[in-house]
Amino acid sequence: MHSPEVLLENSDAVYDYYLRHQQNRWKALGGYAILARRFRPRVAFVDGAKQQLKALIRSGRPVVYAINHLSNSDPYTVAATAWYSPLRSKIGRVRVLAKDELFIDPDQRRKVDMMGGIPVFRGRDHGIRAVNAAGQRMMDICAQRLAAGDHLAVFPEGTCNHVDPTKVQPVGSGIGHIAFRAAKLNAPPALVALAMSYGPQPDPTVEPTAEEAVSARFVFREPVLELPQRPGDIARLVKEELQLAVDGAVARY
């Protein structure tokens, strides 16, 4: 299957491709294992969350993971965390929303595709009106992938937090619309908040380097099995759950 160039003006072909795209699971497992050895995250769970997550994954129900965003290393440290968690069994069936610029360089695109990337054309990069149709299509594709049994990882803050790494930035309604649309396809997802801390940052405007991202603390919250009915309410719940996860990651660093 030909992989189209990831450009906004080509978004229909891009999302047709990523609706059907499937990672090579063995390559994905190898890639995640390498990242796990490189970044060595310290993974923790709130009381009962690990067993609940294991049971949720065994059930086959789709899951949306909401993750805070601190640096450009985050997709790789999150992949390393998946290796050291019950998510290892889902490697190859987890989709990750990633900004479109990560798909420009061919070598980087291969890595992002290996990790299950789905491109996002952001309003801050292209203009809100320009990305509206592509954004609607992206949310539909995510809902369809969830309905097909995939899991979905989202950085719902939308950009790296260069303000205060201990406080979750505003969360847009996109994650709520994805969950809402998946429910309309008879695949209501569960929500799991996953937060990272790279330790104290004297200057939050300077994001952690890849070296500083080694041995980050990650904390999983317990799954939320019943989500609100409206996208905006789902987004508010996401922010609340993610802040609790961030508090835990900072406290346990």
Regions found by a protein language model. Name each.
Residues G60-P62, G92, A148-D150, A187-P188:
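Short coil/turn segments at beta-strand junctions that form active-site/ligand-binding loops
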Residues R109-R110, H151, G158-D233:
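A cross-family acyltransferase "interaction/gating" segment
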Residues Y17, I57-A130:
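Catalytic core of membrane glycerolipid acyltransferases/transacylases, capturing the structured
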Residues A130-M138:
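Glycine-rich anion/phosphate-binding loops
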Residues L35-P62:
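A short, well-structured juxtamembrane/interface segment
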Residues L19-R42, D105-M115, T209-E211:
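Alpha-helical membrane-targeting segments
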Residues P223, P228-Y253:
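A cross-taxonomic marker for long C-terminal extensions/tails that follow the last structured domain
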Residues I141-A147:
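Short amphipathic alpha-helices and their capping/turn segments at secondary-structure boundaries
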